[in-house]
Each structure stands twice: as C-alpha cells, then as structure tokens.
Amino acid sequence: MEGKEEDVRVGANKFPERQPIGTSAQTDKDYKEPPPAPFFEPGELSSWSFYRAGIAEFIATFLFLYITVLTVMGVKRAPNMCASVGIQGIAWAFGGMIFALVYCTAGISGGHINPAVTFGLFLARKLSLTRAVFYIVMQCLGAICGAGVVKGFQPNPYQTLGGGANTVAHGYTKGSGLGAEIIGTFVLVYTVFSATDAKRSARDSHVPILAPLPIGFAVFLVHLATIPITGTGINPARSLGAAIIYNKDHAWDDHWIFWVGPFIGAALAALYHQLVIRAIPFKSRS
C-alpha cells in the first residue's frame, strides 16, 4: 500500500513539514542498493588496503582482549564485589572498548573486531569470503596476543584468576549457555546491521558517525545479562584467545558453545535484517 504525505515533525524542527511515509519515502531518488560483494575476490590479495584492514583488526582485537581481561581479573582479585567495579564495570569495559575501537577502525576495516560480526556481514554479502577469512584469522591472532601479554605481565594472577576464559557457570546447562550466546550475539549483530545501514544514512534518520555508540551499548547490555551465565562470549576470537592462553581443561569443556552460539546468532541476525527489515520494495520511476 502506497504511503501518503502527512504532516510530520522532522528532527528538532518545530515546524511541520510535508514528508512522504511508507514505501513512497524509499524510492531510488534518495537511495540505491549497492551491489553485493563478490563471493571470492582474489584481486584483494594484491591490495595494500586489504592487508592494512587486517592489521587494523589484529590491533583492535589485541587491545580489546588486553583491557577487558585485565578488568575481569581485577574484579576477581577483589575481596568482595563492593571493592571492585563489579559486573557493571566489566560490562562497561567491554562495551566501552568496542565503542572506542569501532570508532577508530571503522574507516579502515569496518571495525568488526569479532568473527561473528564478520560472518554475519559475509552472509549479507557485505564483504567477500577472501576478506572474511582474513579478518577472522587476524582477529583470533590479535585476541591470542592480547591475552598472552596480560599473562606475560601477571603470570601467576592470570592462572589463579581464570584468565578471563569463558565457561558455562555452575547451575546452568549447556543449552542455557548456548541460548545465551545465540541471543546475545543476535542483539549485537542486529545492532551492527541497523547502525551501519546505508539505506538509513541516505535519509535524515541516521547519523553515521554515531554508529559505534549503539554497537558499544549493545555489547554493554548483553554483558549485563549474560555474564552470570557464560561470562559472555558473543565473540569467538575473545573466547579463543583467553582459552588458549589460560589452557585449562574446564576452559575447553564447553568451548564449542562460544563458536556455535555466536555464529548461529549472527546468521539469524543477518537473515532477519536482510529478509525482514530490508524486504520493503523500492519503487522505480521511469
């Protein structure tokens, strides 16, 4: 059904303006759907920008693990929760670092910092398989190095305080942990798609420079909800880096959850955004 023009208030403008609503607001006049990324693009391998983007993902994930693992260890080291930043502080550390790092790297690599985000964007044909695999490898290497530097600086506390490794908490089943990871990653990747949607930035409803803010805030909220269940993975590189450096049996017992869950959540978010949210037809005018 075609939308009609109605009086609406746009932004902070106190004067009513005549604006089309519904599908009439979404013509090719203000937006053109970009072509999907090629499935495989070997030409990228000869481009410096390709490797620069991978280095940016490595450094960002390195810094992410370094700061967040130290924060988790600081909370566990405290004699009681009141003597530390607590769960809220951990959530702020994760969300704040994602906000800062996405802001710093978005213009270079897209600011993924998470294999699940990369996987979701790949399914939506936002990047090629070549770039997706390279990003995931660099993210995992960065996470391993970040956790490794923390252990290098504080070897004994790192081992005794758990090294920031993700495990399913006592009292929760594997299914509960898997569900928490699926839903948590869905929230994150859905937010990434919404915050970076070119269709929105083509109109006045979106300010692209603010995209890191909702992404970081989504990470913060998911951590508040799921830290008591799994310690919050929603990022396979983060879980892998901490598990490899910590290297205790219980850190590997349920490690599959922190890959399967985020990848399922990312796939569901990509499908939902592409098939439901973006499934509004664009009317072409001759």
UniProtKB/Swiss-Prot annotation:
Record the organism: Arabidopsis thaliana (Mouse-ear cress)
Top-rank taxon:
Eukaryota
In-chain residues carrying the UniProt-annotated modification Phosphoserine: 284
Those parts of the protein on the Cytoplasmic side are: 1-54, 103-132, 196-208, 278-286
Which gene is annotated as encoding this protein in its UniProt record?
Answer: PIP1-3
Membrane-traversing stretches? 55-75, 82-102, 133-153, 175-195, 209-229, 257-277
Stored Pfam families: MIP
What protein name is recorded for this chain?
Aquaporin PIP1-3
State any GO CC term: plasma membrane
Function of the protein: Water channel required to facilitate the transport of water across cell membrane. Its function is impaired by Hg(2+).
